[in-house]
Amino acid sequence: MALEEVPSVSRDLDHSALRALSSASPSSLPSSCSRSTTSLLFQSKGIEFRLSIPDTFLSLVEPHRNAFLASYSTQGNTQSPLELALSFLYFLLDQKVSPLVLSSVLRAFNLEFLGNRSEIHSLIADLTPIPKQRQRWLGIYYRFLEASDDKRAEIPLSSIFQHARTNEFQLMAVFGGQGECSRTCLNEFAELYSSYEPMLRRLVGVIGPCLYNLSTSDEYSSYYRNQPLDLKAWITDENHVPDLGFVASAPVSVPVIGALSLARYCVTCHITGCNPGLMRSMLRTATGHSQGLLAAIVVAVSHSWDSFYQATEEVIELLFRLGWECHHAAPCSMVPAANYADVDGANGPSYMLSLRGLKRQETEATIDHVNASLPEDKRLYLALINAYDQFVVAGPVASLLRLESHLVEITSKDIDQSRIPFRDRKPYIQHSFLPVSTPFHTPYLTRAAARVKKQFAARPIPTRRLAIPVYHTHTGLDLRKQGGCALSIAIDAIASEPCNWPCAVASYHASHILTFDRGGLAPLIKRVREGCGVRVVQVADLDTRDSEMATMRDLFATKLLPTSTKLQSWGQQFRPGLASGPKIQLETRLNRVLGAPPIMVAGMTPTTVHPDFVAAIMNAGYHAELAGGGYHNASAMEAAIYDLVSSIPKERGITCNLIYANPRSISWQIELLRRLSNGNVRIDGLTIGAGVPSLTVASEYIETLGLRHISFKPGSVAAIRKVVEIAREHPDFPVILQWTGGRGGGHHSFEDFHAPIIATYGIIRQEPNVYLVAGSGFGDSDSVYPYLTGSWSVAMGHPAMPFDGILLGSRMMVAKEAHTSPAVRRIIAATPGVSDSEWEKTYSGPAGGVITVTSEMGEPIHKIATRGVCLWADLDKTVFSLSRRDRLTYLAQHRRSIIQRLNADFAKPWFGCNSDGEAVDLEDMTYLEVLKRLTALMFVPNKQWIDASYIEFTMTIAQRWLQRLQFDSEAAASLTISLLRKAPDRFLAIFADVCPTAEGDLLNPEDISFFLMQCKTPGRKPVNFIPALDDDFEFYFKKDSLWQAEDVDAVLDQDAERVCILHGPIAARYSKSDSEPAGYILDSILNGVVARLRETSTAEMLLPKLERGHTTPASWSTLSLTERDTSEETSDTSITSLSELIENHSFSSGGVDSVPRPSHPLWMRALLEDDVVLQGTLRQKNPFRDLIQSSPNTVVNYNQDSSELMVTAQEPYHISSFMRAVCHDGVMDKRNERIKSFYSLLWFGHDCDTSQSLNGVFYGPDITLTEDLLDEYNATIGPAYSDHRQMVPSTDVLPISMGIIIAWDVISRPLILRQIGGDLLRLVHRSNTFEYYSDTRLRLGDSVSSRSEVQAVYDDDGGRVVIVEAQILRSRVPVMTVTSTFLFRGSKGTTVPAFRRAREQKWTYDVTSEFEESILLSRNWFRPCDPSLTLVGKSMIFDLNSLVKYHDDGNMELHVQGTAMSQTNGQQQKLAIVDFRNTCTGNPVLDFLQRRGKLAEPRTEFKIPGWAGKSTMDIQMPPSNEPYAQLSKDFNPIHTSPIFSSLAGVPGTLCHGMCTSAIAERVLEHLGLGGDRERLRRFEARFTDMVMPLEKLVVEIKHTGMVDGRMCFSILAKRKETDERVLEGDAEVEQPRTAYLFTGQGSQSKGMGMDLYKTSTGQFLLTNKGGLFWTSCKTTQSPLPIRQKYLDITTEVVLPNGKRVQKPVFPGLTPTSTSYTFRHPRGLLYSTQFAQPAILLFEAAAFAELRAKGYVSHGAVYAGHSLGEFGALSALSRSVPTGALVELAFYRGSVMQASVASDNDGGTTYGMVAMNPKRVGTFFTQTTLDRLVSQIAAQSQELLEIVNFNIEGEQYVCSGTIDRPISGGTWPSLSG
């Protein structure tokens, strides 16, 4: 970039001069500033600005300007002069420039960009919408302001605070608490600090060390791991920020959120130039949401900066302790892994569930419903009432998951409920878990609160110290009136008391509420206080989407912005007023739009179709709508409009009401209105009913029809929003929103009247051009008054919500000028109506004389329940609700009754009627009868035709008849339409004469079609009869059904009960007189409202102005920070020199080379300097040198007097290790013995006898398994998980891994024996195996003991292996074995021979023949107990133990002993003993069993292991091994001392393998067992690598197979970063509670079991004895021969005479028969005698296959359905032979088959059928089915019974005869 030549003020300075200038001291600069200034130009890339620099400083600033522009030309990307100027300020901050120079530049910047019109926040907010950039620019500005040290200018108080000081505004400060902010609080604090570091430096300097020291203290450090709460580092370096889950936890988020709130308050004070005392004086009150209450207390007690920081430090410490205590007091529960969200950013299950969409009463009822199934300690509580329909429920996570599941069931999400009555709808519930780690505001935290209160008992803040009111979040009371300690009150309010937020914020009527929170607090407050005249100020934001909210721009502006002004409440802003004059008038905003009082008459068909009635209302001074729904063509409507125009004053315009749901009509009606408007007809308004058009269509109406206002009648919340959207797009055009809800007369929605308005009133009132009118249910002044004043909503707990006008409809139907027939008026007057709470009863039937039916447009419509309307309602249910196809069928079946009802009850009778007055079809009528029927129905005697179009219709039919019949053409000329119009009787007489055949000829089908087509001709008034029961029946019945209410004379028999009368169910209460003029009705309502307003007001109220004032600030202020309270960070760290350390004989670990001195002993120098040392005769790496070098916190001290070297290693969390080194000769002598003695003291507290024999038994102390022990165990391994509290099941069974803790004493005792040898410093734990004895578990409360034996001592490549097996006993009965394998690394050879004991797996040997028996008996190790007893047919189980002693020559001395058992009839029998002793190289006994036997526990390995649920879990090892050492009593220093671990040659303190195993086992419990740890039978963990504290691992589980009914799992733990394996494990798990169900007859199918038969090689082949039946399964058609042996099978039958005789089961089978053929028409598989054995055989074989693969659970239950009970019995008891069972089934089936008669093909007359009542209908229950079956059986005299009750209400099976129709062919009635 080429710099333009700068004017003459530019001077060239070289770089050396610039550097000299930059480094010049303030004293060398001019002492005073010249008043004259020079405009310094800045120009870069087309952007330029000027700064007016005092001449005194120009020479100092100009070089920096040049250097800046030179550097910026290659780097910057400037978009505006302001951005360029701020970049220059940033550039100057990096230069060493005098504060005076910076001050001059700052004043020039402010003058150029701020002037007197703005302040920096608004300026930067307009500069960029990007938050990061805004933070950067604000940070630059305020750091520059700090560097300039400009204290000469006073900071002007912002306009809001100026108004507060003069009491024009009443300010309330509100602080936020836990919620979504829990995850974002650190990020928000970092952003705040980035923008306002100079203002927050001291605050962070106070809070930061406080939190850090607390988090690293002994009391709390275990939770924070390696992440102590370092606030300064977290907010200044994003690399130090912990993960969001950790941040959101209460021990972190609670204090950080509190600090953030107070930081925002601190910034506000600084920017406005106020100290906390001055700021507090401008606040009327304060409170806080949940923990925000404590921040409010800080504000109330702070009168200066010092007091503010002091109170802040105390409250932040309190919040820290409260967060920690509450977090650890949270109730534990078992939450399945599947319930946790896998989606990033989604909140998983937590302790608090936010829900919205229910009222408080409904919410409490829902909580009670869930709590009813929960124990007392798992219950849920209503924790927060955030708004009238917004709550937070808190409690155990598992309980909240139940609540969430229930909410999903009852919510209406994704369900369209628009056509369901409001009170019958499911609620639409939105719910989500909050990122909160404890259930605040519940009794669960009562004890936690008590502990915190105790900690602060000595540091109280009495409530009398509160200088301003602070309102309690539960009671809403001023804390000062409560007395006592404010901190204690707040602690209880946060921890254990529910929060009633509306109560808290409503305690004081503030004009402005300042919210020091960025989350949802401001919108929540606005929602709670909306309409109350409260302006919400978002102190933490520069922007807002809500036009009524204020932001930081408003808060700091020196001139009042439009969004800062004081708001009026809805009650004040929209209340009605009284205008003085000759007559006091009621006025609302609507008056100016309509030019009439705010009580108007709605468009309604047929009442306001008549222009004379509309004119009467308008001439009375009121507004009324002309209903377009009663006009069927443009000419008629045009005539009516002109008639109306001519009948009203010239200055009045008319409003037309059109039905949007009728597209055909509205299209020509809109065109008509457009044409008339263009012709200067004064059409002022348009009302659209029955639907809201799109924005495009509505805009077209507004812009092209010449309207002055437009009205819409939305029917739902969504439609209301559409109306508001239309108004928003046309802000200068009046939009009237007419709301009637579902209670209005005529067409209505399914909505409640009040709820939609309550939900949308706020958005309606945001648009000043929307006028809200209430309709439906009004009839007198008392009903109108609450809605005009808004008191209706106050009674419901909401702010006053006035309407601008009232809409009357039904009430006007009885007005004197209305065309309503007298008979109809009398019906209306007699209709009682209902209250508002009862109108929804009209959906199910008449209520108050009114009923809801479905109109021709498919919409609900209110009508008086006359006979005709009741018929309508009946047909809606029975006919019109059916599909088209089903409807025609129903009409055909019920034709006669429907016609009868039409003729008796409805205004539109059945058209077909012959000369005798009989109801007939059209095809049964003559041509003349049709004409006579038309005139009889369409012409009213002594009056006229009902409609002119009816004359044309009748003439068209007559002409058609003449075309079809022979007639006298000359005489026909007299059949004119004029004659028909005037004298229809004369017309018919002439027609009969002219066409004599018309009287006798029946209608031709083509003429019938022509007639029906004419009945539906568009543009003609719909016919007033029903011509046919066809597809158009609904059209004929419902179309044009309202006019009869005004012309009862035209109705058959002049019967008003036939007609449809529109009327509202509530408004019916007011129509008691039928002769009041319209003006009188309206005046009485209006005057009554005026009278009540005069009674309630002391002076006449004036109507609020329609226009809203919008002002623009004239100037903006310049901000200067004069009273800032910032301080530089200081460090008190003292550094000691190395020489001082050396003189004091103390050495740091900064480096070995600098530590030793020549004066120190040689052994010490060698110890600390040499790379290697001699251990005995072996050269080893020097562990001491490594220790010193690798431990930065190690201190070495040398005591010259005692010649001792002291080494102290400081670990994190204040754990120290200490070592004393003394030089002695012969240090290796008895070294291992001394180490064993040391470990003996560590493990057992005393020096144990090491000479005990390896073959002895070691006994441990008695231990009681207490809940405290379990809690300590959970707390110890808990830190490994993200939240272990959700992994704690409700069970008294202890984790299997606690076995090692119980047995550690006896497991570790053999390790110190002299015979084992080995260096305990090099001891490694290789594996642990835990295995329960069958059906035993360790439980809380058990008193147990332990004993152990050494099972093996032998050498392998790594060293000497020692295996110790312990038994845990309860009441001297073994419960669990714990086997631990240890390795003494590098140690080999002992004073005793190596040996190994083992309990072998059980083996099964089946002796199937004498040959097998002889082989077994030939083994000399097999010794039968009874040699005379044969073993053939026995299945023996070998239970063996082996002892191996290893010899140096490679041979081994083997001793195998055990027993061979057999099970007979459920009893164990000892058949032989096994005893083998010999020296050998293998195990002959096991070799034999492996060749000829099989494992007793069947096992299956899956080809593809896996797990259907979540199979992995990330863990992080606990930060310290000390807790597990204390718990397990394994104080091996290699786990706790860095000195020892270094001496042992490992990189650090190793985690206990037992701990790693326990952590992995808990993962298995959680992921695989769902917390049901009682199912865990065996667990083995093998340690494959070292694990260090805080290492991140991934634990994975897989289901690998089955063994003897148990599930086999593999467990793998590996490092997360490298995938290196650190633990491998296996587990055996009992299956979940299992039931095996066996089906009965009817479940058979062709080919069943064939796949199994082909693939099975085991148990299934044993069932080949049932091959006869498998053949029947393979084919269902071939006959099958059976031989002689079944001759003797008979069954007893009863003859008709009662005699009992024996009958052969197989008739025709004789002693001489050579064969017998079974037959069945569907195949033998469907013959009972073959189906039953085939089913049982299949079930037995399938179950045997399951058992052979190890799938069958031992604890299962068995059940069978009918025949299946035999299958269940066979599976349960192995003593029942399969062959016998099959044979029994065949006999049973044969007897059953022979018990009923059959035909020649074997078929019977009996059958079974499954029934599902739900498929019939909801009315069809089990009782109905039982009644139906009984009646059919009684009428048919045949067998029919319900024989199976399978699923209640869904599946029943009936049995009985088939093909027996009921006599008479009629179905029995189900009624009664």
UniProtKB/Swiss-Prot annotation:
Enzyme Commission number(s) of this protein: 2.3.1.86, 4.2.1.59, 1.3.1.9, 2.3.1.38
Please give one Gene Ontology molecular function term for this protein: fatty acyl-[ACP] hydrolase activity
Region Disordered, annotated ranges:
1111-1132
Catalytic activity field: acetyl-CoA + n malonyl-CoA + 2n NADPH + 4n H(+) = a long-chain-acyl-CoA + n CoA + n CO2 + 2n NADP(+); holo-[ACP] + acetyl-CoA = acetyl-[ACP] + CoA; holo-[ACP] + malonyl-CoA = malonyl-[ACP] + CoA; a (3R)-hydroxyacyl-[ACP] = a (2E)-enoyl-[ACP] + H2O
UniProt keyword list: Hydrolase, Lyase, Multifunctional enzyme, NAD, NADP, Oxidoreductase, Transferase
The organism's place on the tree of life at top rank: Eukaryota
Biological process terms from the Gene Ontology for this record are: long-chain fatty acid biosynthetic process
Q: Is the keyword rRNA processing in the record?
A: no
The question of whether Transcription is a record keyword is answered with no
Chain residue ranges for the region called Enoyl reductase (ER) domain: 591-836
Q: What is this protein's name?
A: Fatty acid synthase beta subunit pkiC
Q: Which organism is it from?
A: Emericella nidulans (strain FGSC A4 / ATCC 38163 / CBS 112.46 / NRRL 194 / M139)
Gene name linked to the record:
pkiC
